[in-house]
Swiss-Prot record:
GO biological process terms held by the UniProt record: translation
S-S pairs: none
Record flagged with keyword Ribonucleoprotein: yes
Subunit architecture: Part of the 50S ribosomal subunit. Binds 23S rRNA.
Keyword Mitochondrion on entry: no
UniProt keyword annotations, A-Z: Ribonucleoprotein, Ribosomal protein, RNA-binding, rRNA-binding
Protein's UniProt name: Large ribosomal subunit protein eL20
A cellular component term, taken from the record's GO annotations: ribosome
GO MF annotation list: large ribosomal subunit rRNA binding; structural constituent of ribosome
UniProt-listed NCBIfam families: PRK00773.1-1
Similarity remark: Belongs to the eukaryotic ribosomal protein eL20 family.
Gene3D superfamilies registered for this protein in UniProt: 3.10.20.10
InterPro entries the record matches: Ribosomal_eL20, Ribosomal_eL20_dom
Length: 86
């Protein structure tokens, strides 16, 4: 059985491409099984919330971190869950 890990993803994205483009850096913490799934989660989040195209997102660093060092409450709560009943 695979274990879900916490990843810190740092990168930059081009916000507001059509009107006044601004490149902004970001740091997101996500829960995923591996680095590829962590990248996909960031693509989905930034694309759905900010309408950013995948080609406008660049990743600078993706690394696994200890869940206790993360400051986001949502990620801390998700890391405490040990099983899900469907």
């Amino acid at each position: 059985m695979t274990e879900v890990k916490t990843f810190m993803v740092k990168g930059a994205a081009l916000f507001n491409e059509s009107e006044f483009p601004v490149r902004q850096s970001f740091t997101k913490y996500v829960r995923a099984l591996n680095e590829e799934q962590a990248k996909e989660k960031v693509y989905m989040d930034l694309g759905s919330k900010n309408k950013i195209k995948r080609r406008n997102i660049t990743f600078l660093e993706i690394k696994e971190v200890d869940p206790s060092t993360v400051k986001e409450k949502r990620i801390k709560e998700l890391s405490k869950i040990d099983k899900i009943i469907l």
